[in-house]
């Protein structure tokens, strides 16, 4: 399965432990396209419609016009995780390279 950095997919993130983000929700693929081509796993950040989360460090606002979702979203960059590509459900949309770059830069700040 070929996926691209910046793609948004619907995914079931269960099971979870503790404070991990779970449930059936959109995720943003942040893994680079070279790795996406060769690996069976993909690095993602979950999205949430809880706009209060935008005030936390390690988040990034994505408008519904950009995401293709029915609601504005917050990328929970601090909840980064690797999942098997078989978890990926329906493709939703793709964000701009500028937004992808901003998400990656926010991740670098967390590291």
Give the residues covered by each predicted segment.
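C-terminal terminal-subdomain/extension
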Residues: 1, 66-111
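Short, charged beta-turn/beta-strand-edge "cap" motif at the junction between a beta-strand
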Residues: 14-18
